[in-house]
């Protein structure tokens, strides 16, 4: 099982790089800002996933139970990567919806970073802290989806409604996968001890969420499709 999960991680990394490159190429051709934000999102996500492997690749002699100092440094790196790709996706949403308010575009990202840091500083170390820390990512995703639904419900422009309805399948998929992200965190932080699964120390860590990987792969497919259409 560990063999499968390791190569699944490599696939996610490769897909992140390819999607990021495709979005950058499409941006250089079209100068559409949404493609620039997508490029940044998938680039940050590449590092977010790549840092998961650092324990085994850079520090193979470390015990499965990392020191609190090491976990703290890694957590702040996770804040950087998480904020990078989530805020970039939020800017994608704002661009697609035609949102012009700079304050609205900036505040969710600032709240995410501050809340993540507060959880690390205030909460006692343990599974509840890690669960809360990583669930903030899902909350930011749900904010994006909720904001998109609000804009759809409040617009009187039938053309705009029709344009947004074309993304309905992606919208539903993101809701379903977002709920699965939280469910996986509940399972592996609060219910099951990953160490009892016996499939390798890195396969299930505080920085792994396979539902999140699946969600991102869906986004990568859509982004690549749109980027290739721009380049065609």
Residue spans of the language-model regions?
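Short juxtamembrane and helix-loop transition motifs at transmembrane-helix boundaries
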Residues: 1-5, 64-74, 91-102
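Hydrophobic alpha-helical transmembrane segments of multi-pass membrane proteins
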Residues: 10-25, 34-62, 74-87, 110-119, ...
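Membrane-interface interhelical loops and short amphipathic "cap" helices
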Residues: 1-2, 59-69, 125-132, 193-200
């Amino acid at each position: 099982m560990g063999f499968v999960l390791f190569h699944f991680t490599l696939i996610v990394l490769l897909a992140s790089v390819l999607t990021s490159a495709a979005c950058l190429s499409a941006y250089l051709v079209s100068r559409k800002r949404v493609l620039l934000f997508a490029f940044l999102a998938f680039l940050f996500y590449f590092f977010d996933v790549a840092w998961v492997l650092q324990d085994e690749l850079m520090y193979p002699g470390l015990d499965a139970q990392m020191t609190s100092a090491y976990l703290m440094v890694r957590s702040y790196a996770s804040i950087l990567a998480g904020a990078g790709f989530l805020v970039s996706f939020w800017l994608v949403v704002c661009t697609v919806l035609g949102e012009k308010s700079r304050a609205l575009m900036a505040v969710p990202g600032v709240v995410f970073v501050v809340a993540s840091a507060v959880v690390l500083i205030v909460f006692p170390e343990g599974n509840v802290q890690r669960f809360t820390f990583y669930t903030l990512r899902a909350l930011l995703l749900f904010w994006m989806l909720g904001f998109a639904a609000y804009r759809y419900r409040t617009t009187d422009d039938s053309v705009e409604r029709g344009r947004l309805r074309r993304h309905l399948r992606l919208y539903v998929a993101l809701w379903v996968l977002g709920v699965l992200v939280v469910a996986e965190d509940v399972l592996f932080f609060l219910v099951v001890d990953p160490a009892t699964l016996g499939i390798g120390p890195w396969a299930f860590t505080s920085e792994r969420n396979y539902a999140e990987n699946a969600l991102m792969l869906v986004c990568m497919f859509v982004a690549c499709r749109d980027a290739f259409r721009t380049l065609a």
